[in-house]
Amino acid sequence: MIRRLQDSGDLVRAFPRVHFVGIGGTGMSGIAEVMLTLGYEVSGSDNADNAATRRLAKLGARVMRGHSAANVLGTDCVVVSSAIREDNPELMEARSQRIPIMPRAAMLAELMRFRRGIAVAGTHGKTTTTSLAAAVLSEGGLDPTFVIGGQLLAAGANAKLGGGQWLVAEADESDGSFLRLNPLMAVITNIDADHLENYGNDFARVQAAFAEFLQRLPFYGLALLCIDDPEVAALAGKTPRHVMSYGMSENADVRAEDVVQDGPRMRFTLRLPEGTTTPVTLALPGRHNVLNALAAAAIGWQLGVAPDTIARALENFAGIGRRFNDLGEVTTASGARVRVVDDYGHHPRELEAVFAAARGGWPDKRLVVAFQPHRYSRTRDQFDAFAAVLSTVDALVLSEVYPAGEAPIPGADSRALARAIRARGRSEPVVVGQVAGLSEVLPDVLQDGDLLLMMGAGDIGYVAQQIVTDGFVGAPA
């Protein structure tokens, strides 16, 4: 039956049923929540039962555990993430029924079509930068819509439909899907060699993709570029669009001066165009987070948010899930009290930045790291860089690689990485087969007063939460 738009009154009522395959993923769940708020009938399936699926179910989504062809029957549109295989039964059924299929990024682009879009791209720092930008615009009274790849702790969610005209979202370069977006503002935080398996193992193709991303801006659009990053700086010099730069470099349009770390906070002077300066206390540690804050400040300044309002938003920022989350102190069975920090970092450059933030904020503590490598391909491609940065900590425990659907690659597992670190002669890493074993092994490594960083993009975050909630194995209740 052909549906007539005139009879429905609007597009939501004409095509109301949207199904998400892999609804529990960070990018998918945020879009699903916004569409729920817009009035769509949202359903979805996922192999995992997590906080995102439970939240969506509470909001009214119909969430199914596991994938089945029957799940898409009666649906008007199916949204899929790039993690979904071509032989997924729901995807195959949607094709056979000629149900429209939308990649996740394409659906985000559809949402952006009805707002003024701000897309935040870059190999590292997207989630934090997008979250800070949402906080600055909210503090400035602009009530933005946001879609973030992590939980904004102040909102208790990774997405929100705002009443204002601006939508700020992460633009995912990992699979090239950010090239589906057509924002009015585009941020690039940095460009690094990651996800090369999706670019034919050719970094030049990664560089070209970021250049094309900026080409998708309209002629009246704006590129906000971090010129402290050499790759982004090179791009800034040749992009045929309006550019505003940010960074700690003297020639940045928006820059941070007199940067110092004070425990878990950063203090600096924010210098805006036309010479305006404002003191800022950022509620996040690390110089890398100062750069993220500068991008948010540049967005706020462009949209008329007052400098003191920008500073207030940065100072009151409550953080993002799994981005240097201080989970508190835990006591081992031997009585050692340690502070536990959970972080999503999984690339050598991210590890280096987090280690620097930890040492800058807690210089007198031993730095103990429990790390779960993410993907065999990344471990292989960044093997030497991983070995170098992980050799700098005081004690290291490695769990096996989180495969993320990949088959094992010889010489790219945690035991090979431990051998390479051991050969450097600076530390003696401990290897556990399963990430759940960290709770049992860590007490033998930890000393009183240590700072324990639990890092990785897999399921190590659940172990960190479990340790804080239930204690280490063998510890008194």
UniProtKB/Swiss-Prot annotation:
MF terms in GO: ATP binding; UDP-N-acetylmuramate-L-alanine ligase activity
Binding residues for ATP: 122-128
Entry keyword Cell cycle: yes
Pathway: Cell wall biogenesis; peptidoglycan biosynthesis
A single GO cellular-component term on record: cytoplasm
Biological process per Gene Ontology, one example term: cell division
EC numbers, comma separated: 6.3.2.8
A Pfam family per the record: Mur_ligase_C
Cellular localization per UniProt: Cytoplasm
Disulfide bonds: none
InterPro entries named in the record: Mur-like_cat_sf, Mur_ligase_C, Mur_ligase_C_dom_sf, Mur_ligase_cen, Mur_ligase_N, MurCDEF_pg_biosynth, UDP-N-AcMur_Ala_ligase_MurC
Top EC class for this record: ligase
Reaction(s) catalysed by this chain's protein: UDP-N-acetyl-alpha-D-muramate + L-alanine + ATP = UDP-N-acetyl-alpha-D-muramoyl-L-alanine + ADP + phosphate + H(+)
Highest taxon listed in the record's lineage: Bacteria
Free-text function comment from the UniProt entry: Cell wall formation.
Name of the protein described by the UniProt record: UDP-N-acetylmuramate--L-alanine ligase
